Each structure stands twice: as structure tokens, then as C-alpha cells.
Regions:
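Solvent-exposed loop/linker segments at secondary-structure transitions
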Residues: 13-17, 50-54, 175, 193-197, ...
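Acidic, metal/ion-coordinating pockets
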Residues: 2-262, 336-344
Length: 387
């Protein structure tokens, strides 16, 4: 279409399997769609899975993938936590086409994304045609993968180009080919890493640092980072005039209306307890409970919670009265639950060390990746599989 049309983008990032918030996110996506009916595209900027609560982790995050399908989410950048169980597990299971998501990572080597590569289900970009406009999506993974993943994962992922350079390259190819009318970048890195993205990108969504941020690229495009754990969502309208190489794009923040808890960053909204805008009252009069996406999300969580309660309730240890392991203190300087994890890692290694070994054996933990505030969450002195 050569006229002016509006396409809405709704982005989440670093969801990390928090399916307990899945229904809130389903509501937010459907309200975003009711703002521009049939013309909303939900996206993720990575770490959709991995580092997850027990309800999702115990089933290897399949409930989260099912939740994403319920939302209608079909596009995501790869985050480092997608590789938590290895690159092969990501490619063969998480990125299996049956889950319905196009996973994007333009800075992974072309050879790795070939049919015989370790990331054969990954691509540089994908295109959606909505409301008569063609939207190109380009994804990339943080250049700091080596500092947050094991050497084996870093080798298997084979990132051979700077993330921003890869985004600029693919965006330029898309724009100059005339195949798209707008380009959206999904960069799994802190918002500051997107500063050098060029003029061929119209809007950038970032993640990884779990922050809520806004910025501007060197090319003048807005940058958004929408927090983590399903608490927030960035929603923007792309107002597109013309087509192909002659298209112009204006980006406008969307207010989802009453009940939205606004953050300090324009364009990034809280999704807990979201109600509809008065103009959307007719849609809401049917009740969110009757909405397919919301009811499916609720069912997925309820089924997963039931299974998690069954598998996670067994008591595997006890704590003396008044003793607990918690995450108080600094991620950089340690805390008692982190020391416990390091000790447990050492004990696990010691089971495989031959009796005559004279070398020191050291256990490590990454305090920044600990997701629980304390070991004995309910204070009953019993440690369960779930805890």
C-alpha cells in the first residue's frame, strides 16, 4: 500500500518463564490489538525462556513456549538464556517450528544458520505484512555472550559479527531491496548498546539488563527496553506512509489506557491488573475471561502449577531453627545462598574426583543469576525439591 497505515508493535523482553504473569501479558497483548484491531504484532527481545521459576523450569520451559503460542507471539530475538541447556537443545527443541516462533540472530555466522548448522532453525530477519505494510524484523544477540555463557555455548553459537554491525547490514539490505516498508530491530543487549544503529532501522527494542530505558539511535530511531519477568511491555505505533525505499515511518508511543501503571519511561507500560481504555469498553464487556488468548494462558499456568506442586513438594532436607540461606547482600560480593550453591557445586565435583587427587577443588556460583531471595521460602525449616 502506498498510503498511510498504522501497525502496532508490542514488545516484551526477558520474560524468563514467568508464566504466573502469562494471563496479564495475554490481556495486555489483546488490549494492544484492540487499540488497532488486527494490526498488532507481538514480539520478544530474547530470554523468553531460561532462568525460569520452577513451574516452567521443571518442564524445560515448554509451558512458556505454549504460553507464547497462546499470545500469538511468533517473532523473537535469541537471548543468552535460550542456550541454558545448550545450543543443540535450543535449535532442536525450543526453536522447533512446531513452537511457532521465528528466532532471529543476525550476528551468528551464516554457516551456523545453514541447513546443516547448529542453528539451522535461526534466521537473520523475518517479514510480516500487516495492514498492507511490510515490516522487517532483525534480531541480534549481545556481543558479551562469552562473559555470560560457557565456552562450549560461545563456540557453538559462533557469533562472528558485532551485533550492531549485523543489524545495520541486514536492515540496509531489507530497505534497499524494497522488500519492506519499515524495519524493527530486536537486540538482546542493554539499550546503550543500540546507540550506533543506523538510519535503516525505524525502532529498536532491547533487553538483557532487565532495565526500563529509552534512548535514540545514531540514525534517530527510538530505543526501548521493557524490564523483565512479564511486568512491563513497550507498545508503539508505526505510522507508515508510502512503500519500499520511499516509505517514511513515524513512531508514536501507545497508552493502553485505564489501569495501566506507567513507568518513568514513555512507551513502556506496566501490565499488572490492566483494564481497557474507555474506547475499548465494548471489547471488555465480553470479559477477559472469555477471551481465547487470556483463557488459554490461564489454563496453561494452572496446569503447570498443578504439576509443579506435585513434583516439587517432596522434602529433601531441613534447616535448623533460625538458620536460613538468603540473597541479602551484593551480587558482586557474595551472599549466603550463593555460598551454598558454590559448596553444592564443589560437593558434586568431588564425587567424580579420584581418591589420589592433590589439586584444590573449587566450587563457583554466579550470584547475579540466583533467582530466589532465600532457600526456605515459607520458613517451615523444610527444603523441598521446588525450593
Amino acid at each position: 500500500s502506498s498510503g498511510t497505515r498504522t501497525v502496532t508493535i508490542a514488545d516484551i523482553t526477558d520474560f524468563h518463564g514467568h508464566i504466573e504473569r502469562g494471563a496479564d501479558n495475554a490481556t495486555a497483548f489483546t488490549v494492544a490489538d484492540s487499540h488497532n484491531p488486527g494490526n498488532m504484532i507481538p514480539v520478544s527481545t530474547g530470554d523468553l525462556v531460561g532462568g525460569s521459576p520452577y513451574e516452567s523450569a521443571v518442564e524445560k520451559d515448554q509451558p512458556t513456549l505454549d504460553m507464547a503460542k497462546a499470545w500469538g507471539l511468533t517473532i523473537s530475538a535469541i537471548g543468552n538464556h535460550e542456550f541454558d541447556r545448550g545450543v543443540a537443545d535450543f535449535n532442536n527443541r525450543i526453536a522447533d517450528p512446531s513452537n511457532g516462533i521465528d528466532w532471529l540472530c543476525a550476528n551468528a555466522s551464516a554457516a551456523n544458520k545453514s541447513p546443516d548448522g547448529l542453528l539451522s532453525h535461526v534466521r537473520d530477519s523475518t517479514i510480516r505484512t500487516v495492514n498492507g505494510k511490510r515490516i522487517g524484523f532483525v534480531g541480534a544477540l549481545t556481543d558479551a555472550l562469552g562473559s555470560v555463557a560457557t565456552p562450549q555455548i560461545t563456540r557453538d553459537a559462533d557469533l562472528d559479527e558485532r551485533a550492531v554491525d549485523a543489524i545495520n547490514r541486514v536492515a540496509r539490505e531489507l530497505k534497499r531491496s524494497g522488500k519492506v516498508d519499515a524495519v524493527v530491530a530486536l537486540l538482546h543487549a542493554d539499550a546503550s548498546a543500540a546507540a550506533d544503529i543506523g538510519r535503516d532501522v525505524d525502532v529498536v527494542y532491547t533487553g538483557h539488563s532487565h532495565a526500563i530505558k529509552h534512548g535514540t539511535t545514531a540514525g534517530g530511531a527510538p530505543i526501548y527496553e521493557a524490564g523483565s519477568f512479564g511486568r512491563n511491555m513497550a507498545v508503539q505505533d508505526l505510522i507508515i506512509t508510502g512503500a519500499g525505499r520511499r516509505a517514511t515511518v513515524r513512531v508514536a508511543d501507545v497508552d493502553l489506557g485505564n489501569g495501566t501503571s506507567h513507568t518513568a519511561v514513555d512507551g513502556v507500560l506496566g501490565v499488572d491488573g490492566l483494564n481497557a481504555h474507555p474506547a475499548q469498553a465494548a471489547w471488555m464487556s465480553a470479559g477477559a475471561e472469555e477471551n481465547d488468548e487470556v483463557s488459554r494462558a490461564q489454563h496453561i499456568y494452572q496446569a503447570s502449577a498443578t504439576y509443579a506442586n506435585h513434583t516439587g513438594s517432596a522434602v529433601i532436607g531441613t534447616l535448623a531453627s533460625g538458620v536460613n540461606f538468603d540473597k541479602q547482600g551484593s551480587d558482586k560480593h557474595g551472599n549466603t545462598v550463593g555460598v551454598l550453591v558454590a559448596d553444592a557445586n564443589r560437593e558434586s565435583i568431588m564425587k567424580h574426583v579420584y581418591a589420589g587427587n592433590r589439586l584444590p577443588v573449587i566450587g563457583f556460583s554466579n550470584n547475579g543469576s540466583l533467582r530466589t531471595p532465600r532457600l526456605d521460602m515459607n520458613g517451615d525449616g523444610k527444603v523441598t525439591v521446588r525450593e
